Amino acid sequence: MNAKEISTRIDVLDYLRGYALMGIILVNIIPLLSVKLPIPSTSDASYLRFLYLFVEGRFYTIFTFLFGVGFYIFISRANAKGKNGYVLFLRRILVLFIFGLVHVQFHPGEALTVYAICGLIILPFYKANKVVNLVFGMVMLLVLSLYAQKMFMVVPLMLLGIAAGQYRLFERISDQWKVTAVFTGGMFVLSVAGLIYQYQHAPFAFGSGGESIETQQFLRIGITIGPIVSAFYIGLMILLLNFPVVRQVLSPLKSYGRMALTNYLSQTILILVAGKVLDLFDHITYLQSLYFCLAIYVIQLTFSAIWLRHFSFGPLEWVWRTMTYFEFPPMRKTRV
């Protein structure tokens, strides 16, 4: 790894993080505001099906996979700078765990504590052969996905992220667009087949009475096929980012992803504060939750873009970095 590679930020990962965050909030807002189940055959019921088919478990999977990629890049770059990447990573996930402990008091379904714990589990795999990480991650994911529990899929997804980092897949996207196109096409076919199968098991009504078993089966199928759909989403985004016009149009998404920690935690703050002030708890419908998320998108995308014009790090990213390296990096950008 040369000096340029050590200091160069991989933009595509920021785009993907921002993309994942935009999907995650659509799901997280439901339990946070106790959104009521919709009446069958309404627009709210249709939106709920849309969430379970195209969002639930898809963007969380992307975010988890990207944690594995970031894990490999972080340690590699730290080692290349002559620092102890393992020690720095342990500090990094300890700080992440602390953030998670605070966050879980307000959002019981939060992911940071899980990521920190699983970060310890994947640490020995940093030096494993990339083929081993790829094969082991795929086999684990295939087997554990049959249990339809998102928690079981975290470690294998992170291992696949490590393998992607070892293969340097995100550092040469313009050179690999043909391979990416074939991969994305294959994932599209599998995704369509899986989604059709899941849709065929969609319940008439969700979550009550005799329909609860059907609902659970519908959800289990969705979680099982989630990694396939997520792989298609990632491949499609990478293909689109090969076009400069797309990169320009989606540039706010890159800023959003660069401040992923700040935006992830502030999503919860915005939802809970607005829920309290506007009395939304148990009074908001599924479609209204979508409109609320759209408003949060505008706020956070705008804030992220403006903030990063003047500062090098997001607010919580700066705290995270400071506590990881035990030094205070300059926050404000230097003007030339």
Summary of predicted features, one role per range:
Residues 1-336:
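Alpha-helical transmembrane segments and their immediate juxtamembrane cytosolic regions
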